[in-house]
């Protein structure tokens, strides 16, 4: 029996990963991290979506310590989300160490459940400039987890080389485009579905959807060549 852990936020990317994983694995467990995020409504959305789609189980883990250490527009209500990059070249929505912590804890959870894979929706093609979404980082932490726990584990990144339009196409391939569009929460301001239409996350999501809807055949062909 095959088992996977999906790092799950209830957003477009992780929901698309969950939809795909449910067709590939016998047991799919979701893990969501509560780090005091600005858009904490995502935790309730994640609970609802995981239950609705039929995940085997869903664990919500309190990692509030991250909020104390990582100052970001996603962890502080008094820091507006900016479209501009900071002096260090990163967006102010970057939460330092977030994926280091999330993937480490998901790897430990996989050890506990005997899961062979941890699935995360990080992407290097249309990412927001976060260094912990890069393929190089994921491969590095995957190797560290294998060495540190002396157990085979694969961190799977099905969206790594897909752009946002292709991610929409992947949801559509499984007949879930409307579900992902209407039920997920990607917006930094906590608006479900198409979002606030103003934050960087909404811009990325909308541009990808518009591209896919305008060029379905070619985008789907590009997707098929990558998966």
Curated annotation (Swiss-Prot):
Q: How is the cofactor bound?
A: Binds 1 zinc ion per subunit.
Could you name the domain of life of the organism this protein comes from? Answer: Bacteria
**Positions with a binding annotation for Zn(2+):** 187, 196, 199, 202
Which cofactors are named for this entry?
A: Zn(2+)
Keywords of the record: ATP-binding, Ligase, Metal-binding, Nucleotide-binding, Queuosine biosynthesis, Zinc
Q: Does the keyword Nucleotide-binding apply?
A: yes
The residues the record assigns to binding ATP are 8-18
- Report the Gene3D superfamilies cross-referenced here: HUPs
Annotated GO MF terms = ATP binding; ligase activity, forming carbon-nitrogen bonds; zinc ion binding
Pathway assignment: Purine metabolism; 7-cyano-7-deazaguanine biosynthesis
The reaction(s) annotated as catalysed by this protein in its Swiss-Prot or TrEMBL entry are: 7-carboxy-7-deazaguanine + NH4(+) + ATP = 7-cyano-7-deazaguanine + ADP + phosphate + H2O + H(+)
Q: What does this protein do?
A: Catalyzes the ATP-dependent conversion of 7-carboxy-7-deazaguanine (CDG) to 7-cyano-7-deazaguanine (preQ(0)).
Family, per entry? Belongs to the QueC family.
The molecule here is called: 7-cyano-7-deazaguanine synthase
State the gene name recorded for this protein. queC
